């Protein structure tokens, strides 16, 4: 099916934003295709839960606190790398001081029905916020519409080397959250991004928990920041 003119404009806008942040270029742009159903286990889900976020060192020295937003997604893709199910969550905007820890009860979990084939991509983006009000509205909208798995009307195909930022954008777009809710990302400081790849074929009947430990560190205007993020993926059965 050919893209409509409006949809093409949106895709171009997303790709432009992605290029602004990406440390490496994708070999393929995001494209949309006619929706097709993917078989899923009706009694099995995969749940994403943040366990902790710790500020070891801050990006902002003058204010002695960073205004932080964490955005995360579960994206199910089929064997052709088409997005077939998405769930999104967000946390913030929170003022984090050096040494401060945010624990699991402060983060909303998200979940998907486990597909028979393909893979699950769990992606996280940590940003230091410039526009507080706009970011708060984004967090509210993502959490209002994105917590449970959704099958998009138009599937989005990911390129082979998409960044975590690109994957989260695709997941938000597939969930119908739209460009207006995520356009603030081009004004914020990206502190870290990561995607964990979990092929369905590699899942074990005995292993139910998949912990992910991440370190985000770097330098911005001579300020060295350092954050540690821990989350887990859990396979549940009803």
Question: PLM ranges: what are they?
Answer:
Residues 25-28:
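Bacterial signal peptide processing site
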């Amino acid at each position: 099916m050919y893209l409509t003119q409006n949809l093409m404009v949106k895709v171009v806008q997303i790709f432009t934003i992605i290029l602004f942040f990406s440390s490496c270029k994708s070999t393929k742009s995001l494209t949309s295709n006619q929706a097709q159903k993917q078989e899923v286990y009706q009694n099995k889900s995969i749940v994403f839960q943040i366990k902790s976020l710790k500020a070891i060192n801050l990006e902002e020295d003058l204010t002695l606190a960073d205004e932080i937003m964490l955005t995360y997604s579960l994206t199910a893709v089929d064997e052709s790398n088409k997005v077939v199910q998405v769930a999104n969550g967000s946390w913030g905007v929170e003022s984090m001081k050096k040494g401060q820890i945010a624990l699991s009860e402060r983060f909303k979990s998200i979940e998907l029905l486990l597909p028979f084939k393909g893979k699950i991509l769990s992606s996280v983006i940590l940003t230091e916020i410039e526009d507080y009000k706009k970011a708060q509205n984004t967090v509210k909208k993502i959490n209002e519409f994105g917590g449970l798995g959704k099958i998009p009307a138009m599937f989005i195909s990911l390129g082979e080397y998409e960044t975590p930022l690109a994957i989260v954008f695709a997941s938000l777009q597939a969930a119908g959250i739209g460009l207006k809710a995520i356009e603030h990302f081009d004004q914020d400081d990206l502190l870290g991004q990561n995607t964990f790849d979990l092929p369905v074929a590699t899942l074990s009947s005995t292993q139910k928990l998949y912990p992910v430990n991440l370190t985000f560190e770097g330098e911005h205007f001579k300020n060295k920041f350092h954050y540690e993020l821990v989350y887990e993926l859990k396979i549940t059965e009803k």
